[in-house]
UniProtKB/Swiss-Prot annotation:
Gene3D superfamilies for this protein: Acetylglutamate kinase-like, PUA domain
Taxonomy, superkingdom: Bacteria
Matches recorded under Pfam families: AA_kinase, PUA
Source organism of this protein record: Sphingopyxis alaskensis (strain DSM 13593 / LMG 18877 / RB2256) (Sphingomonas alaskensis)
UniProt keyword Nucleotide-binding present: yes
GO MF entries: ATP binding; glutamate 5-kinase activity; RNA binding
UniProt cross-references to NCBIfam families, sorted A to Z: proB (TIGR01027)
Protein name, per record: Glutamate 5-kinase
Amino acid sequence: MSLFPPASCPRLIVKIGSALLVDPGGAVRRDWLTGIAADIAERARAGQQVAVVSSGAIALGARRLGLAKGGRASLEDAQAAAATGQIALSQVWAEVLGAEGLTAAQMLVTLGDLEHRRRYLNAAATLDRLLSLGVVPIINENDSVATEEIRFGDNDRLAARVAQAAAARGVILLSDIDGLYDRNPAQPGAVHIERIERIDAAIEAMADTGSASGMGSGGMVSKIAAARIANAAGAHLAIASGRIDRPLSTAARHSLFVAERGASARKAWLAGGLTAEGRLTIDAGAVKALVGGASLLAAGVTAVSGSFARGDILDIVGPDGRVVARGLSEYPAADAAAIVGLGRDAQEAALGYAPRSAIVHRDHMVLL
């Protein structure tokens, strides 16, 4: 239990990929899953609360329905497979955890449940109560109703968002690969990266966009995106191989993405968000001011795009096109556009009412 022991990680999120749970024929790898349940029980007895983000519903449902391409030939096939497979998946989890004396609970979430603040808080409260009761939540995206436009798209990022909602200190992404390499691990001389202190352009360049199994949807790009979200919320994230028995109780080789520091709940939620309703483009002076801890003033904004209301999440973009921050708008889109580049006196004339202190206040903003 060397990775994220209970003493330093009271709450742990474990994500399990489809290729680990389901064999190429679409059947559950029950013996392997029984070992995972034993690992979770061992950690629970040591005082750790564990939640599982479990893939596999589409793969299981596709087999039962006889759908081609693992149920991914169309969105409708994937939704039907997910609806069918979720029952089978939850039943298996309940059985293997029950054999260890643990109670399983199912939580199906959509992107909106974790992107909209009120729904996020509700989901977080449910998750917290389940964990405090000693229950093992089994979480998955509700693929039976989600569409391409309103879905996470992979369970790696979902696991990171769940970690944030649960205030977990650690996330383990169990996969068919044992971590990050400086190039495709199939190439000669590929070097395994054990510890990542900062996710920069060089780390992102190492990501492989493919999924080795052909069964899931999360390649290394999605795992690095998940690490960004988890680290911003103060949680460390490890990518580890699940191609061994009882991977949570062995010192399996892994890549660890280290969280720099904790984050406030609201700022962690902002940083982890996957969607923004609009964007503000700002000049170089405004970028410097934000880095220095200032709020975003209208005078530093050069362009406004998107349709948004007051309180919506906005991306804040520098002159080079890079997203430098994210925050909650103090204005609806039309009013924000009306005061672009203006000082305070000119803003009041343009709006017809006294302007707010900033377009995005520093208390409602996080640097990226």
